[in-house]
Curated annotation (Swiss-Prot):
Role description: Protein acetyltransferase with dual specificity triggering both N-alpha-acetylation (NTA) and epsilon-lysine acetylation (KA), possibly with a low efficiency or toward specific plastid substrates. Involved in melatonin biosynthesis by catalyzing the formation of N-acetylserotonin (NAS) from serotonin and of melatonin (N-acetyl-5-methoxytryptamine) from 5-methoxytryptamine (5-MT).
PROSITE patterns cross-referenced by the UniProt entry: GNAT
Residues that bind acetyl-CoA: V129, V130, V131, S137, C138, G139, L140, G141, K142, E165, P166, R167, Y172
Organism annotation: Arabidopsis thaliana
UniProt KW Plastid keyword: yes
Protein's name according to its UniProt entry: GCN5-related N-acetyltransferase 1, chloroplastic
Active site positions: Y172 (proton donor)
Length: 197
């Protein structure tokens, strides 16, 4: 699925540095940058405010600091993802351009998670969108996705895609994702299994 909208590239001055890749960061002093009112971004409007989430005991995190990979792996398994090698999860997170996870304050455990990879300029793919089954239907998935999409757009990312199982397409559509926009089809390489003789 692809995030619907116009494909365009914002000026480099609007791109923010990545919180996960500081060695690639480009910063600009706010005193150097002035933008016409039409170019200034409005504050994001989320379905659940950060304050409301916090009042309910949910803490938003945008870095891997404090993220227990064994606990995250348990959330993956609880939603039906295969259990993963935590060393490989760590490598995947090192190559992640943006992420957002929710920590439940009472248990200090991750209860929702999503991440994105991409080229840092034009394209990103969202991966691993999960919400612990005990915390589903309270808006955490939507809260994570709204903020991750906003984080990518603020960086100037124009094309945002994700892979989705058919049963959850209805979750992504209200967020702006469309299947097969303008006839575009996603394709996946599948390694052929060798016949054992």
């Amino acid at each position: 699925m692809f995030l619907g909208g116009t494909i365009s590239t914002p000026p480099a001055s609007l791109r923010l540095r990545s919180t996960l890749n500081p060695q690639n960061a480009v910063t600009q002093s706010s005193s150097q940058a002035t933008f016409p009112a039409a170019m200034q971004r409005k504050p994001p409007s989320y379905s659940i405010s950060d304050e409301d989430l916090e009042s309910r005991g949910f803490l938003l995190r945008r870095t891997t600091e404090g993220l227990n990979l064994d606990q995250l792996n348990s959330v993956f398994a609880a939603v039906g993802f295969p259990r993963r090698d935590t060393a490989k999860i760590e490598v995947a997170l090192q190559h992640t351009d943006a992420l957002l996870w929710v920590e439940y304050e009472k248990t200090r455990r991750p209860v929702a998670f999503a991440r994105a990879t991409g080229d840092g300029v034009f394209n990103a793919i969202i991966w691993d969108v999960v919400v612990d089954p005990s915390f589903q239907s309270c808006g955490l998935g939507k809260a994570v996705m709204e903020r991750l999409i906003e984080d990518l757009q603020v960086k100037g990312i124009c094309n945002i895609a994700l892979y989705s199982e058919p049963r959850v397409l209805g979750f992504y559509r209200p967020l702006g994702f469309v299947s097969d926009p303008d006839g575009i089809k996603g394709m996946v390489f599948i390694r052929k299994q060798r016949n054992k003789k």
